[in-house]
UniProtKB/Swiss-Prot annotation:
Mg(2+) binds at residues 173, 193. It comes from Synechocystis sp. (strain ATCC 27184 / PCC 6803 / Kazusa). GO terms for biological process: ribosome biogenesis. This is GTPase Obg. Keywords: Cytoplasm, GTP-binding, Hydrolase, Magnesium, Metal-binding, Nucleotide-binding. It holds the Pfam family GTP1_OBG. The keyword Cell inner membrane does not apply.
């Protein structure tokens, strides 16, 4: 399947139904008065995050989404039927921008999360609403309002906890294939990987963690050279970076610094992410040469270095043990931060509550 991570589309909510002009006509009621109903609401265009989608490819073929118009109001004060909403499935991790205002409308990250991107117009009022002492038989009603219309830009940022980065042909695809059931294209030439590959790696407990194999970065990637500029955004959501460094390719230290400089140039907090360096293809060098490379790396980075061979699976158990340890520590820190935030919010609510003088929260009493 072709990987598409950007798209521009048009969305339009349905027009509200027109109000009705009618009068009550019944036997023995010669002047029944106005009885025109309101028009129905126009349908809305709604985005819904779908965990089964991984690309915006569908938007290459369908670029305009319009919801159904509301129905006209009826007689006997009957309101017209509402127009049907159009629900559009998008991948989790889709960011929705309004092209006119260049503002972010929403970020759909959780399966089932919804975002209304074009609201339907309100239905027009029927003539029943215009009855007054001066006008006992109004012969006019309001038309329905037009629905919202927007030009949108969709941008997909993959949801992965671990991002695998490195120069082309460093062995990133071989690594994700060795760790997961993913089967990316693997060959002995640069830029074999042209799109991000996702793989679910299982912990010893059976829980799955998503790894993203990012296409090879080169010098100038942050400025748009090569493939890196297109895919650096997918690193933004990762929690941990796994830098695969080919110890047999030219100058490994210079190669490492190239990637670090590109991450720093791209910005957006990427260089602040925890990083593990995986020295790959160690079976091609002797231990002394690998030790020299590791010693030199420590001059430029405090990240831990692990020795692996993705092709033979050598050292992968130790690598994954460190990855799981770091991810578990991050999850514990996040849980503790969330707990403290909830306590703070509870304390503020208790102090602002005039009916509670002393409210115990998690064993602590806060006096208002």
């Amino acid at each position: 399947m072709q990987f598409i991570d950007q798209a521009e589309i048009e969305v339009q909510g349905g027009k509200g139904g027109d109000g009705m002009v009618s009068f009550r006509r019944e036997k023995y009621v010669p002047a029944g008065g106005p009885s025109g109903g309101n028009g129905g609401r126009g349908g809305s265009v709604i985005f819904e995050a779908d965990a089964n989608l991984q690309t915006l490819l569908d938007f290459r073929y369908a670029r305009i989404f319009k919801a159904e118009d509301g129905k006209k109001g009826g007689s006997s004060n009957c309101t017209g039927a509402n127009g049907k909403d159009v629900v559009v499935q998008v991948p989790c991790g889709t960011m929705v921008y309004d092209l006119d205002g260049e503002c972010l409308l929403g970020d759909l990250v959780s399966p089932g999360q919804r975002l209304c991107v074009a609201a339907g117009g309100k239905g027009g009022l029927g003539n029943q609403h215009f009855l007054s002492n001066r006008n006992r038989a109004p012969e006019y009603a309001l038309p329905g309002l037009e629905g919202e219309q927007r030009q949108l830009r969709l941008e997909l940022k993959l949801l992965a906890e671990v991002g695998i980065i490195g120069l082309p042909n460093a062995g990133k695809s071989t690594l994700i294939a060795a760790l997961s059931a993913a089967r990316p294209k693997i060959a002995d030439y640069p830029f074999t990987t042209l799109v991000p590959n996702l793989g679910v790696v299982r912990k010893p407990t059976g829980d799955g963690t998503v790894f993203a194999d990012i296409p090879g970065l080169i010098e100038g990637a942050a400025a748009g050279i090569g493939l890196g500029h297109e895919f650096l955004r997918h690193i933004e959501r990762t929690r941990l970076l796994l830098h695969v460094l080919d110890v047999t390719a030219g100058d490994p230290i210079a190669n490492f610094r190239v990637i670090q400089q590109e991450l720093d140039a791209y910005g957006r907090g990427i260089t602040e992410k925890p990083q593990i360096i995986a020295l790959n293809k160690i079976d091609a060098l002797d231990g002394e040469m690998i030790g020299e490379i590791e010693t030199e790396l420590k001059r430029f980075s405090t990240a831990p270095c692990l020795h692996i061979s993705a092709a033979t699976r050598r050292g992968l158990d130790d690598l994954m043990q460190l990855v799981w340890q770091w991810l578990d520590e991050m999850a514990a820190a996040d849980a503790e931060a969330q707990r403290l935030l909830e306590l703070e919010l509870q304390a503020q609510a208790a102090m602002n509550n005039p009916f509670n003088s002393d409210v115990p929260i998690d064993g602590v009493t806060y006096s208002s």
